[in-house]
C-alpha cells in the first residue's frame, strides 16, 4: 500500500500557476514533452487544470517545447 501523494501547490498556498515560471512547469512535463498526469504527480484537480493551461500558454509563446524533437 503506497502513501497518497500531496499536491505541492496546495501545501505552498499558490493562488494561481504562472505560465512564465518555466522551471516549475518543466517538473510537470516528461522527457517527450507531454504533460504528466495528476495520478503520477499527486496534483489536485484544480491545480492540474491550471497547470495544463499554463503549460499550453508557455508552449504557444515558445517558452516550452511541444515535443522532444525541438531539443535537437
Curated annotation (Swiss-Prot):
InterPro entries cross-referenced by the UniProt entry: Ribosomal_bS18, Ribosomal_bS18_CS, Ribosomal_bS18_sf
Keywords assigned by UniProt, alphabetized: Ribonucleoprotein, Ribosomal protein, RNA-binding, rRNA-binding
GO BP term, example: translation
GO terms for cellular component: cytosolic small ribosomal subunit
A Pfam family that the UniProt record links to this protein: Ribosomal_S18
Superkingdom of source: Bacteria
Single Gene Ontology MF annotation: structural constituent of ribosome
Family note: Belongs to the bacterial ribosomal protein bS18 family.
Function according to Swiss-Prot or TrEMBL: Binds as a heterodimer with protein bS6 to the central domain of the 16S rRNA, where it helps stabilize the platform of the 30S subunit.
Subunit-level organization: Part of the 30S ribosomal subunit. Forms a tight heterodimer with protein bS6.
Name this protein carries in UniProt: Small ribosomal subunit protein bS18
Organism name: Francisella tularensis subsp. holarctica (strain OSU18)
Biological classification of the source: Bacteria, Pseudomonadati, Pseudomonadota, Gammaproteobacteria, Thiotrichales
Amino acid at each position: 500500500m503506497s502513501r497518497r501523494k500531496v499536491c505541492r501547490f496546495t501545501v505552498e498556498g499558490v493562488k494561481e500557476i504562472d505560465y512564465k515560471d518555466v522551471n516549475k512547469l518543466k517538473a510537470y512535463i516528461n522527457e517527450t514533452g507531454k504533460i504528466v498526469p495528476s495520478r503520477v504527480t499527486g496534483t489536485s484537480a484544480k491545480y492540474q487544470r491550471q497547470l495544463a493551461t499554463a503549460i499550453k500558454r508557455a508552449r504557444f509563446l515558445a517558452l516550452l517545447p511541444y515535443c522532444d524533437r525541438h531539443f535537437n
